[in-house]
């Protein structure tokens, strides 16, 4: 490369300087202040880890989307594509015998290959918080309430937090005869709101009609608390009903704090990360096509109850 070319950054990364850098620092500081007020303690994990921390069995990003390399012992290492699995590993190591609630927060870069995605970055800054050893709906509600406060602290006035539950889809899928590969295809159709493809896929499958009807309607199961009431009347699946009752409790918690205007329920919400086992949420605001916040409960990643 010539000297002039060395002034540029590789594709997918960028320099942040001047006013933009100052704004980012101010926003990060404000969010960190809210997290500290909620009792969260700082934690730092390595920028790269062993590949197995993020492999497919643990429900993170696809192997092809990771930046991988080898150490001198021929171990496969990756630049972290997500910080949550790193936190889970750290907690399993240092807090294995801890039974009391644990609250941890962090800031760091994540790295994902995004070939084919125009305008998206491979390196992004991730700010997050993890609450361990608390399986209650109160914990779910508190994390979402803190998310709303963090967004308000960032200066956002118009935003919505969409809330769903992983067990609604999983409960309905239990009643089907779909194979794992077919389930992944169905999830893609649902994420793309492709109702016609969903109908075509399920047309001649062996499953209860109520289950088929709800799966087809999933992309439209979006709205206020009345959406939960509607779906409860349409299914007898115990796993899905338990998830819906959980969402009702979360609504009551948030409504008691006057935060109900900031939330909607998306009962067809499916997460990119497979490790989520319970409540899932994403926050959106005007001018961005993607979620500005993603989160949820994962009780299997480190054998602890976490949101």
Regions found by a protein language model. Name each.
Residues 1-85, 141, 162:
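TRNA-binding/sensing appendages of the translation machinery
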Residues 15, 174-177:
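Phosphate-rich ligand and nucleic-acid binding surfaces
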Residues 20-38, 49-50, 69, 73, ...:
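Positively charged, Gly/Ser-enriched RNA/tRNA-binding surfaces
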Residues 41-43, 159, 181, 262:
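A local structural micro-motif
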Residues 47-64, 164-175, 269-277:
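Beta-rich nucleic-acid/ligand-interaction surfaces
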Residues 65-71, 177-200, 207, 259:
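Acidic, His- and aromatic-enriched active-site or binding-groove loops in soluble protein domains
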Residues 154, 167-169, 182:
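Extended alpha-helical scaffolds
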Residues 158-168, 186, 264-268:
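Short, surface-exposed recognition loops or helix-turn segments adjacent to catalytic cores
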């Amino acid at each position: 490369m010539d000297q002039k070319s060395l002034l540029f950054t590789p594709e997918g990364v960028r320099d942040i300087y001047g006013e933009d850098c100052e704004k980012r620092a101010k926003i990060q500081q404000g969010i960190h202040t809210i997290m500290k007020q909620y009792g969260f303690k700082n934690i730092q994990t390595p920028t790269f880890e062993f590949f197995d921390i993020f492999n497919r069995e643990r429900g993170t990003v696809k192997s092809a989307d990771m930046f991988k390399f080898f150490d001198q012992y021929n171990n496969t290492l990756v630049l972290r594509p997500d910080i949550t699995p790193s936190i889970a590993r750290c907690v399993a190591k240092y807090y294995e015998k801890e039974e009391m609630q644990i609250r941890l927060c962090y800031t760091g870069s994540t790295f994902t290959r995004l070939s084919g995605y125009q305008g998206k970055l491979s390196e992004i800054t991730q700010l997050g918080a993890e609450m361990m050893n608390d399986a209650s709906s109160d914990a779910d509600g508190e994390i979402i309430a803190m998310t709303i406060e963090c967004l308000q602290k960032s200066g956002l006035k118009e935003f919505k937090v969409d809330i769903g539950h992983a067990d609604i889809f999983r409960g309905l899928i239990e009643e089907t005869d779909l194979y794992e590969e077919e389930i992944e295809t169905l999830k893609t159709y649902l994420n793309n709101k492709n109702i016609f493809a969903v109908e075509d896929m399920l047309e001649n499958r062996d499953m209860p009609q109520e289950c088929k009807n709800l799966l087809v309607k999933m992309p439209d199961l979006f709205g206020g608390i009345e959406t939960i009431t509607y779906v409860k009347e349409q299914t007898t699946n115990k796993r899905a009903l338990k998830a819906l009752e959980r969402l009702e409790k979360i609504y009551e918690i948030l409504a008691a704090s006057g935060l109900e205007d900031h939330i909607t329920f998306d009962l067809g919400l499916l997460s990119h990360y497979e490790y989520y086992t319970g409540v899932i949420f994403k926050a959106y605001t005007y001018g961005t096509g993607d979620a500005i916040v993603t989160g949820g409960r994962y009780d299997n990643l480190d054998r602890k109850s976490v949101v």
